Amino acid sequence: MKCFKIFDATLRDGGYYTDWDFDNQIVDAYINAMNALPIDYLELGYRNNPTKEYMGKYGYCPVSVLKHIRAISTKKLDVMLNEKSTKPEDLDTLIKPLVGIVDMIRVAIDPKNFDRAVVLAKAIKSMGFELGFNCMYMSRWLTDYPDFLKKLNQINGVADLFCMVDSFGGMTPKELTTIVKEVRVNTTVPVGFHGHNNLQLGLINTLTAIDLGLDYVDCTVLGMGRGAGNLNTELLLTYLNAQQGIEVDFNVLGDVITAFTPLYEKYRWGTQLPYMISGANSIPQKEVMELVTNRAYSFDSIVRGLQNRKDHVKDNAKYPILETEKFDNVIIIGGGSSPVEHLDSIKAFINKTTSVALVFATARHAGLFVDIDVPHYYCLVGREAKRLKNNVSADKFKGVCVLPPYPRKLGTDVPDYAERTTFEIRSLDFTQGFEDSCTALAIQTALNVGKGNIYVVGYDGYPGSILSEKEVTLTNETKTLFRDYEKHTGEKMKSLTNSLYPELEVESIYQFL
């Protein structure tokens, strides 16, 4: 018989991937499975004041949703509040309607706000709920918050749980043991542990917590959770069944895994090198997750940016400012299929046009133009340095590489053969907020080196009415940049090939031949 309680936080922590939207069938399958498994509490999501950012059903946990789950669940239920965005005067709206529906309110707390959090906790406790005090940034407590642990006696008689949160996923069993001893010296409140899996230590840290006699541990189905995720519920239960004889219905456990597998296949949470680096160096999961899920950033660039941060440097390289040569005609080459389809005509146009330069927003088609004897400018953002190396060999390279302004968020990568002919722009003048955009860098480069016509090819747009999330994001970004160009110059950008972007003015290349 286990002498500790298990929180399953799948819907709350997993919501960081789904924006807290879960299909009703998945939730019902989850609740039914949890009813048959040795789980004590289900953490269903957040209660929040209205925010500008979208949060789905389990980001707000409407009362009607909680009532439905209360009716079908045999487990204790809890929801979480963020202390930083919750004041005592909000509680009548946020949690008073939950009396008799949920059993515990857990509050996410930054140690620096401990005193303020105690006031909030007392107000919550007075409403009759069990209270969980979830304190973040555990790996920094002894270094960054030296007085924090000494204050824990203030929650005696208030909190029913003091949960230690390894926010960065970098704790070791030895460090965990040290902190548990310090915590127990300072409070009589039952202690819990919520781990993250950046260094694949979620299981061993949780087992260490159990061996140390902690009262609560957290887990999630398939480890679903922010960034690198959490300890897998199925892994913990399998171990406890084998080692402690805790009864587990593995058919039910398999069913809930099956229910969440499509979400895993879609979002692919779990640790990988960027999360490992962030865990080992206590870098916030939120920041790394935003990088890993961003279409523009290569794996190498994320690792490089994290390494720069670890080394406390702004960027790993700095280059001279791009000189503003002035060409009468500049052609920006994008990544669509039209440069391939109209290659001969584009080359003919270039050959008959005087004072012309090519700016490659992406190196995808760069190899097609190495035989054209005009200046080439290659924009290097994200994965483009690697793409350039793949498409243009050292013996064929005759151009200039262009980088965004210094310092670059994720560091700098330049092909070895281009080191001597690499420059950076001083600033992004025609738009704001797109420092990591290939198209933004290409347009600014064209403005810097051109004095007349600026054309594009390869900005075809995506056909069809149903676009992927990546295509929608890229389309919206590109539209914004074309509109910003028009505001900056007073005229639309001209496309020499057909395009679905209404922000472009199409002038068929064939009229010039």
Spans of features found by a protein language model:
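Catalytic cores and adjacent flexible loops of soluble metabolic enzymes
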Residues: M1-D328
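Metal-ion/cofactor- or nucleotide/acyl-coenzyme-handling active-site neighborhoods
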Residues: I321-V359, H365-L513
